[in-house]
Amino acid sequence: MLQTTVISSILVFSLVILLLVVLLGIAEKKLLPQGDVEILINDDKEKSPNVKPGSSLLSALASQSIFIPSACGGGGTCSQCKCQVLEGGGEILPTEVSHFSRSEIQDNYRLACQVKVKNDMSVKIPDEIFSIQKWDCTVRSNHNVATFIKELVLELPKGEILDFKSGGYIQIDVPKYEFKYSEFDIEKEYHEDWDNYKMWDLLAKNDNPEEYRAYSMANHPAEGNIVMLNVRIAHPPPQQWDAPPGIASSYIFNLKPGDKVTISGPYGEFFIKDTEREMVYIG
């Protein structure tokens, strides 16, 4: 009797899941247009791609090599993916309101990561966005410079230059992965601290193939053929050691010389102003 009840419960549960999947498929076909939609950019047809509906505006443009800054990886928290959605974006979402002033909302400013592409759209983005590029770089070195900090040096493809200003940053793509911290190459002088904190026991995992994070360059702009990043490992806090460690920092700590890494950039707007006024630098 008990066995029959268990089997019946499993069958009912499976049928409910199957029904929901079918309903979602039908709803998607009904609510989303079939075929591509156009994103008109800055009223310029030549810059305006046709994309598949269903993704965020941020992801849709990135698929066409138009990279709007998003330091939080599309989480809706950094507000750096601001743009004007003039048509086709619908009403502003509650998750966006706190990032804009009343006048900005009236001027149709939105967060590209929160706007879903459902139909033809008209948007306005800064022209400098089109100078942002994407490269497949090679890891030159990845050494510890402190107990929990690594200095990652990436080489751009031959002949390519990252033309950035001090204060700029890049975004690094994080692929799907799963590995243990015991696989990291950590200099022996830091092993004792890693032993004490039981860092080797941690497990890192990323299931999202479209994950990315922003990191500021640590090298001089004149060294445009490399990208140097100083990255601190984001391990769980001591009182919540069962929490997952940082997705991007764990990925970076596991990189070895010769590995391929995809980056985009340069991004940034926090630069030294050309002024005669006195400036105070805090490090």
Sequence positions of predicted segments:
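Membrane-cytosol interface motif
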Residues: 36-55
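Feature marks short, highly hydrophobic, charge-poor N-terminal signal-anchor/signal peptide-like helices
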Residues: 1-13
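Residue-level marker of beta-strand positions
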Residues: 56, 80, 169, 257-260
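Transmembrane-cytosolic junction motif
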Residues: 21-42
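Ferredoxin-reductase
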Residues: 138-257
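Iron-sulfur (Fe-S) cluster-binding segments and ferredoxin-like electron-carrier domains
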Residues: 58-69, 79-130
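FNR/FR-type flavoprotein reductase catalytic core
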Residues: 243-283
